[in-house]
Design a protein with these regions (language model features):
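Serine-esterase "nucleophile elbow" of acetyl-processing enzymes
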Residues: 1-72
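Alpha-helical cap/lid subdomain in secreted, periplasmic
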Residues: 38-43, 59-195
Length: 195
């Protein structure tokens, strides 16, 4: 990407009165973070590590390791599949596995989220013929890893598929209603996994 970014959030960084959960993702996780916070208010502090970096970028792993080691987490929600779409599936799968094993060494409760669809620019009702097959292949790889490691899956793809009214025109992102819908589903998955 021409511009790389990392956006992190520690909620009530000095407080220890509630357990913490960690959301890991790309820009989609930035969108639903506030909704997850509202849903889990009073139950968990909701921290977030979001980045544009592809999963094989060495800085991705270094930054995430540093961030994830700051606190003990009750649960981690891992949603990272919309960046670096030109990389081969094998590279994605290999580095996803490495990242997953690093996370599991810190927290046994990891939820694997399926990435959301990509639509044509200015046509939120039409799936991208070029990019959405990449998302589907990556989601299939995540499902196989979830089965192998016996981890829960949060299907954010199906949650928003076929709902053009909650999509923005850029092909990737969601309206406030779309982010709220995802946030509720993420919070539900976190509550279930963190029990």
């Amino acid at each position: 990407e021409a511009l790389e970014w990392t956006n992190t959030w520690w909620e009530q960084a000095e407080s220890e009165d509630l357990p913490r959960v960690l959301l890991i993702g790309d820009s989609i996780s930035v969108g639903y973070h506030t909704a997850v916070q509202k849903e889990l208010d009073g139950l968990y502090y909701v921290d977030r590590f979001s980045t544009s970096k592809f999963i094989s970028d060495p800085f991705f792993r270094r930054e995430l390791e540093l961030y994830a080691s700051e606190y003990t987490y009750r649960c981690i929600h891992f949603n990272h599949g919309l960046n670096g779409l030109d990389f081969p599936l094998e590279v994605y799968r290999d580095h996803y596995r490495r990242t997953l094993e690093m996370l599991l060494a810190r927290c046994p409760r990891v939820i694997l989220a399926l990435s959301t669809p990509i639509t044509e620019v200015d046509h939120p009702d039409v799936l991208s013929a070029e990019l959405n097959p990449v998302v589907l292949a990556r989601n299939e790889a995540v499902l196989r890893l979830a089965e192998e490691y016996r981890l829960p899956v949060n299907d954010l793809y199906e949650a928003v598929a076929g709902k053009p009214s909650i999509r923005k025109a850029d092909g990737y992102h969601y309206t406030e209603d779309g982010a709220a819908l995802q946030g509720k589903q993420v919070a539900q998955a976190v509550r279930k996994a963190a029990e």
